[in-house]
Amino acid sequence: MNIIIDPKVSGEELRRQLYAGNLIILTHLRALENFVDYTREQLIDLFRPYEPEHVHEHIDPAEMARILGGWKPRFIHSDTSKKLVREIIQEAGFPAEQTHYDLPKPRTSFPQGHLTTGVAFAFPWHRDTWYSAPAQQINWWLPIFPVREDNAMSFDPASFARAVPNSSGAFDYYRNNASRLTTAQQVTREQQARPAALSHQPEQQLVIIPAPGQILLFSGTQLHVSIPNTSGLARYSVDFRTVDVPDLLSGRAAPLVDVQCTGTAIRDFLNVADGSAFDEELVTKLYGAPPSDAMLVFEAPNA
């Protein structure tokens, strides 16, 4: 695994590097700075008069779940959020017509002892592909406030193309969509199926700490984990994902070595240029026909 900063290459070469297991950090995108400013202002307004990084000292977990459960869907489905994400993707060199993206997800990581379930779930060792992500998925992760090695996330470079025992066989994307309707109510106990590595103890871990205004790109095959937050500060980040259409059609992708889940998240991805979803006939050809009663795409109440 290599860590590549601001590579001067095409979007196609960026994807090739990511499919090979490398990590890429982009540091000079004006659209990214605009997105960070926009998100930070929302968090400051949401928690006023408290500082977002210290808000857990003043608000209990149940009230925090209520506040975030109301704000996160508004942020995710905001036209401004989507517009800013599209601008980031295009400024990074990914052609709009052949790139699909999913909606930006704000993540919150509170210090241990506070809210770590539901809307603030702390992810164990996992690959996004265990959550029915396509093999062509590229993750884009950016902090909103400064992060540290004791509240960020960690990678296991040695396991990128090596099978790891995991629980992804119990995960079905369509059933998970239905269970997400109660995510904001999960305050003390996690109720959703969350695929994870089983008793995973990597020999080495790699922690990447981009600054606000920088963004980390990595393949959905990368094995990574939310570091238990012992910093005393709340961590706020946003992530979204992209899929390249020619890569999807040709099968060019990162390796799938241990994926056992069912269903597919591909319908969540919208074209950067015109907002269209993948054609259902194509999805069925690539991934098979879904059950007749499946919730193919999650729809948040009042989104």
What are these regions (language model features)?
Residues 222-303:
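Non-heme Fe(II)/2-oxoglutarate
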Residues 31-32, 113, 130, 146-148, ...:
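Short, solvent-exposed loop/turn segments at secondary-structure junctions
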Residues 90-154:
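Conserved double-stranded beta-helix
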Residues 1-92, 211, 283-303:
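N-terminal auxiliary "cap/dimerization" subdomain that precedes the catalytic jelly-roll/cupin core
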Residues 150, 154-219:
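Double-stranded beta-helix
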Residues 19-23, 59-72, 99-104, 136-138, ...:
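Glycine-rich, often proline-containing surface loops adjacent to acidic residues and nearby aromatics
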Residues 125-129, 202-206, 225:
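Short secondary-structure capping micro-motifs at structural edges
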Residues 138, 214, 236:
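Residue-level detector of short, conserved catalytic/binding motifs and their immediate flanks
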